[in-house]
């Protein structure tokens, strides 16, 4: 919205609309944010996360797997502040089916929620109810993060792209599908630098600097 407010509508069984209820809404309703403006919003299957105008992070809705990041594992019907263990500002956020990831302006990246396929990128498969750091090359800074069903991808300011998590259908893009998934980010080998990325449930796509489009997965 022009005034940086946020409006949501549709299913609200887990409080994903953020209006303090579980009632579905058939027309857009305003999300109460105490006058704070919204910079970016991302909706998962049953939860929502937003970067505020001051670059802080709030999430709400389904929290069964800890995908809100507040450490509680209980649904939140209204936006709650998410504490990122970094003295930096949120740049980009994406909400997947049951996990979320955020990139910070100091080049760090954090993920939380469901992790059975390593989609949090921290080397393990244990779910996390609070943001967990993703180990990255110190020379890279994430400019975009895209989260699928059970995998995640990030675009860096270097023009490189990394993916991690479920790879049963080749959605990581390294040419070696495995059912267990990759638990740490893997840098993809592409013909050119990457301009833009998008991730679906079980596939991924990238626009390259030669204006070509490449996709993989199912």
Predicted feature residues:
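Intrinsically disordered, low-complexity repeat/linker tracts enriched for polar/charged residues
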Residues: 16, 47, 67, 99, ...
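Surface loop/turn motifs at the tips and blade-to-blade linkers of beta-strand repeat domains
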Residues: 31-33, 83-85, 135-137, 188-190
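Structural WD40 beta-propeller signal
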Residues: 1, 34, 44, 51-52, ...
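Polar/charged side chains located within well-ordered beta-strands of beta-rich proteins
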Residues: 30, 42-43, 48, 81, ...
